[in-house]
Amino acid sequence: MSNQLSPKPPVNPIVMGKIGSAYGIRGWLRVFSSTEDAESIFDYQPWFIQSKSGWQLVEIEGWKYHNQDLIIKVKGTDDRDAANLLTNCEIVVDSSQLPDLGEGDYYWKDLMGCQVVTVAGYELGKVIDMMETGSNDVMVIKANLKDAFGVKERLVPFLTEQVVKRVDLSTQTIEVDWDPGF
């Protein structure tokens, strides 16, 4: 009997990537990483996926690059059929594993659900998603139902100082210098 404790399911889960399609016939799978450097996803262990019965531990046997794809071998997944069962599952870890960020840097997960208000006090709506465009991140903001401009969704660049004037995570508020009609 092993004295080693099994990893605990995430208390504060965060999605770090997604398992893609099967690769080959020996149970390898493509992985799509949400980390800045694709292979940094392996720095965060253990991995979990959500199944019908709850959290399921995913143990990595190995990983490598194949062309531009990152592929993994999951312990106990030895053929294509077993690999296909994991396709499209989100890779989740506990957010306590994430490093602390410096002043003015934020994890996207912390910005989700924040109310976005202009410097003039107009409520633009809530952040429902973030997008990476290459030059800068963009907030996807779901407008309030009674938006005076008839807008349902806004895309606002997350440019500190230029557009984003203040972020207060304790009150879940982001203040922006942005024209509500845009």
From Swiss-Prot:
Coiled coil: none annotated. The keyword Membrane does not apply. Its main location: cytoplasm. Keywords: Chaperone, Cytoplasm, Ribosome biogenesis, rRNA processing. One of its GO terms (biological process) is ribosomal small subunit biogenesis. GO terms for cellular component: cytoplasm; ribosome. Residues 102-182 form the PRC barrel domain. It is found in: Cytoplasm. The keyword Chaperone applies. One of its GO terms (molecular function) is ribosome binding. It comes from the Bacteria. Belongs to the RimM family. HAMAP family: Ribosome_mat_RimM (MF_00014). Binds ribosomal protein uS19. The PRC barrel domain binds ribosomal protein uS19. An accessory protein needed during the final step in the assembly of 30S ribosomal subunit, possibly for assembly of the head region. Essential for efficient processing of 16S rRNA. May be needed both before and after RbfA during the maturation of 16S rRNA. It has affinity for free ribosomal 30S subunits but not for 70S ribosomes. NCBIfam families: 16S_RimM. This is Ribosome maturation factor RimM. It comes from Pectobacterium carotovorum subsp. carotovorum (strain PC1). The lineage of its organism: Bacteria, Pseudomonadati, Pseudomonadota, Gammaproteobacteria, Enterobacterales. The gene is rimM.
